[in-house]
Regions:
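Conserved PLP-enzyme active-site core in the AAT-like
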Residues: 2-35, 39, 47-56, 62, ...
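C-terminal, active-site-flanking charged/polar segments
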Residues: 22, 367-372, 427-429
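A short, surface-exposed helix-loop junction/capping segment
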Residues: 60-67, 351
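Short, solvent-exposed beta-strand edge segments and adjacent coil->beta transition regions
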Residues: 264-266, 344, 402-406
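Short beta-strand-to-loop capping motifs
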Residues: 271, 349-352, 409-411
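Short, conserved charged micro-motifs
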Residues: 278, 356-364, 412-421
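Conserved small-domain helix->loop->beta segment predominantly found in fold-type I
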Residues: 292-301, 307-370, 374-401, 437-446
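PLP-dependent enzyme catalytic core of the Aspartate aminotransferase-like
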Residues: 311, 375, 387-459
């Protein structure tokens, strides 16, 4: 369309009231939750940008599809519809449903990853890293240098450093690298895309070494759209065809359908290796359910199948990426430091730059995230040293490479006025960022501590 205003390419037929907790209620909620935003009740949040995973709105087609869900324990019609869509999209012949992406990771890594292994990735996200490390392996991040600099405007900051991959293979040895993973888009690094050229280069290195190559494909459609916009030779290609080419370069994928499956729950593991698939299915039956439902209801399988078809619609993707850019542009123009360019699913605020007076060991990104909620009821999530610091044997921590706050935008859920409100809150908090103070952890779990840790302010 010739007009500059972004419009949502859908009409809204059903609404849900938003809670509007006051400042006193929000302060009480923070105290009760130990200043961990995961501990807030949903009705204590005004705008919830904690995650885009499973929090979006489904379409009328998806809701209609749920009405014909087949709940048969074995051989459900809904599974075969789901299987057909996944096979058409990915080209992988073995499709294993799971209740969400981390279940696919756990099953795959339990079979394929051993103690002492090294698993290279552009950047592991939290559950991927934890599932690798739970097997006693090293989750090694080898994103390009530009991907670690929030201010660099590189078109594909999610790219894997191919030279570093080759060096890792040389250093570690082929026998200790069970697979190479590329996450599209790169969630931990700002929602940044990976180019087709980079995927081809990674594939060539893996093929030469005989190492399986997997995609963490949660946001494959958003990545495909960035390729269409930014990579030579793809401007006239349909996003679905670009996505198919991405999958064709890999030996398998894990997928959370709660992102680019446009569903509220679900995921899958898809591979070409029949022997690997058989082992994975045996473990699936033990922990998730039978092979034709994998812990999902039939109506969930229907919703995912339809979502995987809708997500590559060009009008949807144009709206999706531009609406994220809209928030990024508003706050950046006001001088708020962000990861540039904007990611596909989220805007990432650079807390280290916004609050340089807070030492990294006092978690500046956690401080910023808390203040966004305290000030305006906006819930984001810390993507920094709370989530990704490496705890060392002497009790100290190796900080994360970046201190970010992610504002993840649920799909087809909020309108432009909601995002305008978020921008106002961010700009106001940023204007007073010199008043932010640090936090210390007073309680934490061994794995994925950011979900349940409790904090106290450092005064």
């Amino acid at each position: 369309m010739p007009y500059r205003t972004i419009i949502e390419p859908f009409r809204i037929h059903s609404t849900e009231a938003i809670a509007l907790p006051g400042a006193e209620q929000r302060e009480e909620a923070l105290l009760r939750a130990g200043y961990n935003l995961f501990g807030l009740h949903a009705d204590e949040v005004i705008i919830d940008l904690l995650t885009d995973s499973g929090t979006g709105a489904m379409s009328s087609r998806q809701w209609a599809g749920m009405m014909v869900g087949d709940e048969s324990y074995a051989g459900s019609r809904s599974f075969y519809r789901f299987q057909s869509v996944v096979e058409e999209l990915t080209g992988f012949g073995e499709v294993i449903p799971t209740h969400q992406g981390r279940a696919a990771e756990r099953i795959l890594f339990s079979i394929a990853v051993s103690d002492g292994d090294v698993v290279p990735n552009n950047t592991h996200f939290d559950t991927t890293r934890a599932n690798v490390e739970y097997q006693g392996a090293e989750a090694r991040d080898i994103v390009i240098a530009e991907g670690l600099d929030p201010d660099v405007a590189h078109p594909f900051k999610g790219n894997m450093d191919v030279a570093a991959l080759e060096a890792t293979i040389e250093e570690v040895g082929i026998d200790r690298i069970p697979m190479v993973i590329v996450t599209v888009t790169n969630n931990s690094g700002g929602g940044q895309p990976v180019s087709m050229e980079n995927l081809r280069a990674v594939k060539e290195v893996c093929a030469a070494a005989g190492i399986p190559f997997f995609l963490d494909a949660c946001r494959f459609a958003e990545n495909a759209w960035f390729i269409k916009l930014r990579e030579d030779g793809y401007a006239d290609a349909h996003p679905r065809d670009i996505a198919k080419e991405m999958f064709s370069l890999a030996d398998g994928c894990t997928m959370s359908a709660k992102k680019d499956g446009l569903a509220n729950i679900g995921g899958f593991l898809a591979v070409n290796d029949k022997a690997l698939a058989e082992e994975c299915r045996n473990l699936l039956i033990l922990t998730e359910g039978f092979t034709t439902y994998g812990g999902l209801a039939g109506y969930d399988l229907e919703a995912i199948a339809i979502g995987l078809q809708e997500v590559t619609d060009p009008e949807y993707l144009r709206y999706r990426i531009r609406s994220t850019e809209y928030l990024a542009d508003k706050v950046a123009k006001a001088g708020v430091p962000i990861v540039s360019p904007a990611g596909g699913h989220a805007v990432y605020l650079n807390a280290a730059k916004l609050a340089p007076h807070i030492p990294v060991e006092q978690y500046p990104a956690q401080s910023l995230a808390v203040e966004l909620y305290r000030n305006g009821g906006v819930r984001g999530v810390e993507i920094g040293s709370v989530m990704f610091a490496k705890r060392l044997e002497d009790g100290t921590e190796q900080p994360a490479p970046m201190e970010l706050v992610r504002l993840a935008i649920p799909r087809r859920t909020y309108t432009q006025s909601h995002i305008d409100y978020v921008a106002e809150v961010v700009i106001d908090v940023a204007a007073n960022s010199d008043k932010l103070h640090g936090y210390q952890i007073v309680e934490q779990a061994q794995w994925l501590r950011h979900f349940t840790a409790r904090f106290e302010p450092v005064t």
